[in-house]
Swiss-Prot record:
Listed GO biological process terms: carotenoid biosynthetic process; chlorophyll biosynthetic process; methylation; photosynthesis
Name of protein: Demethylspheroidene O-methyltransferase
Gene: crtF
Naturally occurring in which organism (per UniProt): Rhodobacter capsulatus (Rhodopseudomonas capsulata)
Enzyme class: transferase
Stretches of the chain forming a coiled coil according to its record: none
Pathway assignment: Carotenoid biosynthesis; spheroidene biosynthesis
Keywords: Carotenoid biosynthesis, Chlorophyll biosynthesis, Methyltransferase, Photosynthesis, S-adenosyl-L-methionine, Transferase
Pfam families in the cross-refs: Methyltransf_2
InterPro entries: COMT-like (IPR016461), O_MeTrfase_dom (IPR001077), SAM-dependent_MTases_sf (IPR029063)
Family: Belongs to the class I-like SAM-binding methyltransferase superfamily. Cation-independent O-methyltransferase family.
GO molecular function, one term: O-methyltransferase activity
Amino acid sequence: ALPPGGRLIISEAMAGGAKPDRACDVYFAFYTMAMSSGRTRSPEEIKQMLEKAGFTKVSKPRTLRPFITSVIEAERG
């Protein structure tokens, strides 16, 4: 288990955002359809899930290629 104050980093394609992200949305929609489970989520959806699980200081730092993957950092409260 992650101790209080521990940090979690999520790096994956996320739904929504600038125009290049739409291609990523479509790609991962087909990917998850082929895998029969999962879906892309927006950074806001992921933030809400993290906060519900007790994480704080949720942030989304800028990445070099946001159309491929995004990053969310959170700290366990």
